[in-house]
């Protein structure tokens, strides 16, 4: 089926089996000039080595590789950290945060070179198709969107390999069923394989960055983090930019088996999925941020921040990065984060990270008031009137029930 002629499409290209097949498929079925766009957000060097040559051999007219690692951490990861967002209580949103920056740069390239279409390799079962296309709609509503997985009949690994062989395009992929992995500077995820059965216990093939906590060092390691307005600015008294902070803490955390989660999550499209996620640096940073939060936020602010984090986790997960509500919640979180400044010393030991010391110039904690010993600043009798008023509605309700 030959579609429109003389058109140009920008493909979000990873170099994997799917997107390698998409290039010739687009040319065959749409008669398009295919421009490959590669976002370097910290995936393994193995995935990036020779990727330009590979895309051209697959039929792309050109390949554009963008180094987005620093921008990803500074403008996407750190802002979300300020909100305290954890999807369904544990997922630090590593894949979800990466999609908007990829889509944004893909759109910018398309507009710059005069392309009229965008294409992604996300499957029709996953969240990423929604995330990409939500971003496309917000940033370039007039560009066409092509989602091959919702059109073609190449719905198995075997059929994709046969298609590439037919097109004389070489690939290192095999028929062996392997895990699906997604990696960037913030995290790595592993899905598929034995994980598709929730009764199967994950094995070490499911983990890529972190050592098994059982095999981690027998002695704990301590790390000091300095935070300024909700952002980590130094590690062990060494000032580092956001990307370097994350990389340093990834290395430290991985050595101690920190940041592993094996979860079943609710996908946006309705089904449940299981994944093994590793976010060693992010787990350490989030623990430090929460430690300072406890010192500096009053009760109402703390509760408001928890609500922001809960809502933001769904917004980011669902691909609504460029929505007005995301920007509004970010502004609220940024305001609260102005107080989150201080130092935290964390203990790293066999898969756990614990904030063991914390201090802040904005601390609301007063040892004088909190002591269980004798004090001269708090009159315990003052609690009488407070309790009478605070319990008044409960008392009236109980009296009515006795009538």
Swiss-Prot record:
Q: Where in the cell is it found?
A: Cytoplasm
Which superkingdom?
A: Bacteria
A molecular function (GO) term = ATP binding
Q: Which reaction does it catalyse?
A: L-citrulline + L-aspartate + ATP = 2-(N(omega)-L-arginino)succinate + AMP + diphosphate + H(+)
Q: Which UniProt keywords apply?
A: Amino-acid biosynthesis, Arginine biosynthesis, ATP-binding, Cytoplasm, Ligase, Nucleotide-binding
State the SUPFAM superfamilies in the record. Answer: Adenine nucleotide alpha hydrolases-like, Argininosuccinate synthetase, C-terminal domain
**GO cellular component terms, A-Z:** cytoplasm
Binding of ATP: at which residues?
12-20, 39, 121
Q: Which InterPro entries match?
A: Arginosuc_syn_C, Arginosuc_syn_N, Arginosuc_synth, Arginosuc_synth_CS, Arginosuc_synth_type_1_subfam, AS_cat/multimer_dom_body, Rossmann-like_a/b/a_fold
Query: What EC number(s) would the UniProt record show?
Result: 6.3.4.5
Q: Which Gene3D superfamilies match?
A: Argininosuccinate synthetase, chain A, domain 2, HUPs, Single helix bin
Give me the residues that bind L-citrulline, please.
91, 127, 131, 180, 189, 265, 277
Locate the residues binding L-aspartate.
123, 127-128
EC class, as a word, reads: ligase
Q: In which pathway does it act?
A: Amino-acid biosynthesis; L-arginine biosynthesis; L-arginine from L-ornithine and carbamoyl phosphate: step 2/3
Q: For this chain's UniProt record, which GO biological process terms are given?
A: argininosuccinate metabolic process; L-arginine biosynthetic process; urea cycle
Primary subcellular site in the record, as a coarse category: cytoplasm
Which HAMAP family does the annotation name? Answer: Arg_succ_synth_type1
What family is this protein classified in? Belongs to the argininosuccinate synthase family. Type 1 subfamily.
Q: How does the annotation summarize its subunit structure?
A: Homotetramer.
This chain's protein is named Argininosuccinate synthase
Source organism of this protein record: Buchnera aphidicola subsp. Acyrthosiphon pisum (strain APS)
Starting at the broadest rank, the lineage of the source organism is: Bacteria, Pseudomonadati, Pseudomonadota, Gammaproteobacteria, Enterobacterales
């Amino acid at each position: 089926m030959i579609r429109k002629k003389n058109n140009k499409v920008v493909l979000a290209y990873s170099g994997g089996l799917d997107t390698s097949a998409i290039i010739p498929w687009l040319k065959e079925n749409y008669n398009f000039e295919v421009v490959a766009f590669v976002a370097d957000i910290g995936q393994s060097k193995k995935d990036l080595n020779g990727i330009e040559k590979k895309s051209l051999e697959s039929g792309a007219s050109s390949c554009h590789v963008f180094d987005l690692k620093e921008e990803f951490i500074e403008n996407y990861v750190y802002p979300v950290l300020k909100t305290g967002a954890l999807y369904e209580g544990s997922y630090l949103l590593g894949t979800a945060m990466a999609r908007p920056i990829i889509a944004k740069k893909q759109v910018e390239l398309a507009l710059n070179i005069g392309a009229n279409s965008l294409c992604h390799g996300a499957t029709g079962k996953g969240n990423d198709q929604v995330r990409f296309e939500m971003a496309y709609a917000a940033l370039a509503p007039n560009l066409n969107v092509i989602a091959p997985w919702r059109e073609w009949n190449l719905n198995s690994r075997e059929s994709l390999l046969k298609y590439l062989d037919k097109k004389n395009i070489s690939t290192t992929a095999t028929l062996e069923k392997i895990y699906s992995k997604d990696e960037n500077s913030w995290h790595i995820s592993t899905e598929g394989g034995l994980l598709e059965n929730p009764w199967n216990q994950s094995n070490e093939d499911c983990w890529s960055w972190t050592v098994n906590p059982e095999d981690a060092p027998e002695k704990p390691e301590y790390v000091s983090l300095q935070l300024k307005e909700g952002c980590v600015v130094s590690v062990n008294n060494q000032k580092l930019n956001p990307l370097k902070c994350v990389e340093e803490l990834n290395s430290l955390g991985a050595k101690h088996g920190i940041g592993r989660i094996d979860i079943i999550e609710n996908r946006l499209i309705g089904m449940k999925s299981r994944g093994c996620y590793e976010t060693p640096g992010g787990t350490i940073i989030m623990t430090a941020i929460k430690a300072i939060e406890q010192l500096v936020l009053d009760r109402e602010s703390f509760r408001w921040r928890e609500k922001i984090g809960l809502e933001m986790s769904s917004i980011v997960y669902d691909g609504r990065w460029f929505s007005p509500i995301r920007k509004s919640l970010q502004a609220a979180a940024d305001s609260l984060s102005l107080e989150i400044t201080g130092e935290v010393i964390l203990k790293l030991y066999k898969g756990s990270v614990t904030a063991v010391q914390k201090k802040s110039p904005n601390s609301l904690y007063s040892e004088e008031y909190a002591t269980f010993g004798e004090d001269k600043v708090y009159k315990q009798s003052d609690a009488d009137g407070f309790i009478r008023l605070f319990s008044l509605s409960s008392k009236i309700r109980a009296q009515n029930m006795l009538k």
